[in-house]
A protein has these predicted regions:
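Nucleotide/phosphate-binding catalytic cleft detector across ATP-hydrolyzing
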Residues: 1-154, 162-267
Length: 267
């Protein structure tokens, strides 16, 4: 057994784990399935994600992260423990040093919760770093120079916007509109226009498969199956990329407005 340095992107939608020298070794949804009666964890990650919207009454699928921060501390700890044990079995290390990405502008209490959850997995030492800075370095930006670099990191729960220079963040903003909000926008759009009820997994599939935020930039279609709210029966519609763009427009404009505000504050 030997120590390793690992990086964790503890996202609202997904958890990614990077091991120094090996690259990304885990990328799974931030979901835990529990027994609703006993609260006992039944599945974590990809296996639990398959249960979203499909679980019987006794099984509850939980997303312990909300808007980039811990919403359910105990479940987050269970999830982190599971993922670290999973990669530990493959990589043969003990008590790693862990770097965790966190959204900019979260409170000290929220930072402490993330750090404590990681420490309870047996980490030797835990470091926190703001997501925009990590994203910039990962994208190959040289943030040590006196010139400005802007990063827009659209995650599952938050969009982090930052201007970086001389190795640090000059100004930043974090808004709680991101990938999950896009999924909800799609669900609402289909419900309002077609009187069809679809789940969040279906909405995410639509977003990934035919989604766009630029009008006319993508011309694809997808058959979408859901429950007709009038008849109560299963029904299938055909959705286009233009419709997805329309569904996402308001949320995208909110992000653009935040980006313009962040840029103006340092000009």
């Amino acid at each position: 057994m030997f120590n390793k340095d690992i990086g964790i992107d503890l996202g609202t939608a997904n958890v990614l784990i990077y091991i120094k020298g090996q690259g990304i070794v885990l990328n799974e949804p931030s979901v835990v399935a529990i027994d609703a009666d006993t609260k006992r964890p039944l599945a974590v990650g990809s296996e639990a994600h398959e249960m979203l919207g499909r679980t019987p009454g006794k099984v509850k699928a939980i997303k312990p992260m909300k808007d980039g921060v811990i919403a359910d501390y105990d479940t987050t700890e269970v999830m982190l423990n599971y993922f670290i044990k999973k990669i530990n079995g493959k990589s043969f290390f003990s008590r790693p040093r862990i770097l965790i990405c966190c959204p900019s502008n979260i409170t000290q209490v929220e930072k402490n919760a993330i750090k404590e959850a990681a420490e309870r997995t047996g980490a030797k030492k835990v470091f926190l770093e703001e997501e925009p800075k990590v994203a910039a370095i990962g994208a190959g930006m040289d943030i040590s120079k006196p010139s400005g670099n802007m990063v827009i990191d659209i995650g599952g729960g938050t969009t982090d916007i930052a201007i970086l220079s001389l190795g640090g963040i000059v100004n930043s903003a974090s808004i709680r509109i991101a990938g999950n909000a896009f999924d909800n926008d799609i669900v609402k759009y289909i419900k309002n226009k077609y009187k069809l009820l679809v789940g969040e997994r279906t909405a995410e599939d639509i977003k990934i498969s035919i989604g766009t935020v630029f009008p006319g930039s993508r011309n694809e279609k997808m058959e979408v199956r859901g429950r007709d709210l009038v008849t109560g029966l299963p029904h299938t519609i055909t959705l286009t990329s233009d419709e997805v763009e329309e569904a996402l427009r308001e949320s995208v404009y909110t992000i653009i407005h935040a980006v313009k505000g962040d840029r103006k504050s340092v000009v």
